[in-house]
């Protein structure tokens, strides 16, 4: 079996050693070299031609973002960012994903050894996914505003429910940016750690006509608003309070190894919204969301899955399609317009 060749770039000798230990403990991958900074890494990339690069965000001589930008322009390859679990780390990591990084892992603030070892399987899964991922062009600087679509109508009864993982931050941006300000409410679960989703919501809010915010427990769901599940600590559910939809955040065990889980959101939407919802599953590894999307379909919702050609990682959509959970499969570029078309359809299903 051909092993996945990994180059680890980090200014911390401790982190380089731990990443090497973790990666080499898996039989399908190996660290072929490590580098303390991007300038050394540049020569090692030429020498070893790695399949995946793990790249620290903040380093001396040249920071990770500058190096990533040059790398994706001159020699594109799958990159997994290694970021500190801080608000600043979150903002930098989101920019790295815009520049073309496939995914990221977080370094704990304290107890780095125990923290990284604890996430050994997650790190290995992300490297495997990156090795198979489709590279995409970096997002243009400033994100030129797309042509806004027209909403067929705004109704407090209609909802769009979205789930995503690896590659999802850019996919979500592409879905939301064309939507008009009077779009129905949208609830999104994107796999992210605590502290990152607020920065993500703020970035989206600055780019979109709809209002994007990190969801709060108990808040009423309003048209023209997008609610992003807070990362890491709770699951987001859709519920009812009289005639209104409300958001519930629940601190319970991970589902499908994730918290927040897409399945939890989708199952709650099936129960609370039934045929008034549209369910959308986007790029991501694993199977989270597949069973929940099927539950939404059985409850009367219209359901959509991103197609293989436009996914960074065709995992979650593949599982949903295999279950028969998706009414339609389409390229990412078509999803926004299709959502609004479905919202304008008459009948018992959205």
UniProtKB/Swiss-Prot annotation:
Residues that bear 4-aspartylphosphate: 56
Keyword field: Chemotaxis, Cytoplasm, Hydrolase, Phosphoprotein
Location of the protein in the cell: Cytoplasm
Domain annotation Response regulatory: ranges: 5-122
Signal keyword on record: no
NCBIfam families with a match to the protein in the record: PRK00742.1 (NF001965), PRK12555.1 (NF009206)
Protein name stated in the entry: Protein-glutamate methylesterase/protein-glutamine glutaminase
Native source species: Bordetella parapertussis (strain 12822 / ATCC BAA-587 / NCTC 13253)
Species lineage: Bacteria, Pseudomonadati, Pseudomonadota, Betaproteobacteria, Burkholderiales
